[in-house]
Amino acid sequence: RVTRWSALLYYDLPDGNLLLTRVGTRRAASGVAEGENIEQAYYRADMSERFSDYVGISMSVSPIAGFSPDTAYDSVTLATARDPEAAKMRYRKRIVIVESTLMASQQAQRAIDWEMNRRYGRSKQLSVTIDSWRDKAGKLWEPNTLIPVNIPTLKLPNTELLIADVTFTRDSDGTHARLTLMPPEAFTVQPYAFYQQLAGFNQ
């Protein structure tokens, strides 16, 4: 809860310390590429948790309003967003109740954009096993780091993804690192506003 209120992510560093930070903008000295350092790769693109349209509404919606699916929420709609990729497949709407603090601070659109972008990011997950614990600069792979990815076979040519998780292994088969990678949008922090931050709250 504290990290959400502060708009922070948290994860372990290689030395065991806990780091509180924002979504990473730091780039590794090298990345992963087909035919170079990748031993195994698996890419999952899952549309089951994505929607064509997102509608943010206030709490004052009445169940009686459900008689008209197309217009029932018009009077309480605060923000909308459309996922163009999901919209090409089918119409699928998601209704989101916007928190009162976000309504009062005019952040409803931000909240709906976050809902859509996070679902987009989490729907695209790449898992790779590579032959080294470190990038070309000798630095250990770390979560929240952007790396270049080039895997044409999986339709991921020359893209950039964020490291979500790292597992280092050393056994009879050698030294390996397993990386879980996603688009940075998967880790954007959910908007939040304290009541005390709202104009006129303490007056």
Where are these regions (language model features)?
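Intrinsic-disorder/low-complexity, polar/charged segments enriched in Ser/Thr/Lys/Arg/Asp/Glu/Gln
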Residues: 125-127, 176-178
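Acidic, small/polar-enriched beta strand-loop surface segments
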Residues: 4, 9-120, 127, 135-172, ...
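A generic structural motif
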Residues: 17-19, 177-181
